[in-house]
Amino acid sequence: MNLYDVIRRPLVTEKGVMKKDTERTLCFEVSADANKTQVKSAVEKLFKVKVDEVRTATFEGKLRRRGRFSGYRSDWKKAYVKLKAGEKVPDFAEI
């Protein structure tokens, strides 16, 4: 799997920014097929940092309706990546 297939986009949310500032933890939307070792290696290669720990959470797609037609959004996965002590936390606004 390609590095850019593993990491889809950074999640810039209120909780994610708070974790980035206090706990050196980054938040990403990742591929549903990616595992923790793939996420770790992708972050280390893309941002040139050392990763301490990866935690993942899987979310089911929500029901969405448009008029009389209904369907589901795709399932997705979120990854919290904690950096080792002494590593510079990348700012997504600079990238």
Curated annotation (Swiss-Prot):
Cross-referenced InterPro entries: Nucleotide-bd_a/b_plait_sf, Ribosomal_uL23-like, Ribosomal_uL23/eL15/eS24_sf, Ribosomal_uL23_CS
Any GO molecular function: rRNA binding
GO biological process: translation
Ribonucleoprotein is among the record's keywords: yes
Highest taxon, organism lineage: Bacteria
Alphabetized Gene3D superfamilies for the sequence: 3.30.70.330
Gene Ontology CC annotation, any one: ribonucleoprotein complex
Keywords attached to this entry: Ribonucleoprotein, Ribosomal protein, RNA-binding, rRNA-binding
UniProt xrefs under NCBIfam families: PRK05738.1-3, PRK05738.2-4, PRK05738.3-2
Quaternary state and interactors: Part of the 50S ribosomal subunit. Contacts protein L29, and trigger factor when it is bound to the ribosome.
Family as reported in the entry's similarity comment: Belongs to the universal ribosomal protein uL23 family.
Function: One of the early assembly proteins it binds 23S rRNA. One of the proteins that surrounds the polypeptide exit tunnel on the outside of the ribosome. Forms the main docking site for trigger factor binding to the ribosome.
Protein name: Large ribosomal subunit protein uL23
Origin organism lineage: Bacteria, Pseudomonadati, Acidobacteriota, Terriglobia, Bryobacterales
